[in-house]
Regions:
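Conserved phosphate-binding catalytic cores of ATP/NTP-utilizing and phosphoryl-transfer enzymes
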Residues: 49-90, 168, 207-217
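N-terminal glycine/serine-rich phosphate-binding loop of ATP-dependent small-molecule kinases
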Residues: 1-61, 191
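Glycine-rich phosphate-binding loops at beta-strand->alpha-helix junctions
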Residues: 43-44, 169-193, 200
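Glycine-rich phosphate-binding loop plus the immediately following alpha-helix
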Residues: 91-134, 201, 207-212
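Glycine-rich phosphate-binding/hydrolytic loop that grips phosphoryl groups
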Residues: 61-64, 106-109, 197-226
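Adenine-nucleotide phosphate-binding core of ATP-dependent small-molecule kinases
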Residues: 134-176, 198
């Protein structure tokens, strides 16, 4: 059984039939018909499986597997959108999905690093952010500031911080936030949140799919979707 999280920029897979299942990643632009899976989620997942599960459902199941607290907020930041789930007393309390304020967020952050030849591992957190409503529209603010004399690195750092604060507010401004997605590997983004952040990595949705597959195989397994 192969599970797939099909994102806009990257797709993640887990082959449960392998002797030692390990997740792996490939660029979504290289996907072919050979990449069909048993259960899929993600923006383009319906094209690669007969069984598709909504991303919010999978995110919730992944959070249940990886987070021990009964009360938590889990935010997933992807290439083209952001989504969150909020649990209270071990039960789903709220959720949200936004492709407007999160439009092309992860993609834009990655694109800027390439364009300006920047390393987010060494960029310091700026003293103030840009007011950013979405990734695409925020780029014009960067170019305006660079033309006005702001160093490239500082302008991009303010943009990244603005994106992080916007995502934080979308998730309800929690005091502690669990983070999912490729931006977990971006220290500038993680450190720009005005709260405690616990990065869970980019395979949370695969964990959710694995829990769903386990439940399918053993409906009596209460731990699968507890």
């Amino acid at each position: 059984m192969i599970l797939g999280d099909f994102g806009t920029s990257y797709s993640k897979f887990l082959d449960l039939s392998a002797a030692r299942p390990e997740p792996y990643i490939i660029p979504s632009k290289t996907l072919t018909v050979e990449n069909r899976v048993t259960i899929a989620t993600g923006h383009i997942g319906k094209r690669f499986s007969d069984r598709y599960v909504n991303e919010l459902t999978v995110l919730a199941r992944g959070g249940e597997q990886l987070i021990t607290e009964n009360d938590f907020v889990l935010l997933d930041c992807g290439s083209r959108d952001i989504k969150f789930i909020h649990y209270i007393d071990g039960r789903l309390n709220d959720m949200g999905w936004n492709s407007e304020c999160g439009a092309s967020m992860g993609f834009t952050i990655e694109l800027l690093a390439r364009y300006y030849d920047l390393d987010y591992h060494v960029l310091p957190v700026p003293d103030r952010p840009f007011s950013v409503t979405c990734g695409v529209l925020g780029m014009s603010r960067i170019f305006d500031d660079v033309v006005s004399g702001t160093p490239d690195a500082e302008a991009v750092a303010r943009f990244v911080m603005g994106i992080a604060i916007n995502a934080y507010r979308f998730a309800g401004s929690p005091t502690k936030l669990y983070l999912s997605g490729g931006l977990c590997d971006n220290p500038l983004f993680v450190q720009s949140f005005p709260c405690q952040v616990v990065p869970l990595g980019r395979f949370v949705l695969l964990e959710g799919l694995k829990a769903i597959a386990r439940k399918d195989n053993n409906p009596q397994d209460s731990k699968a979707l507890s």
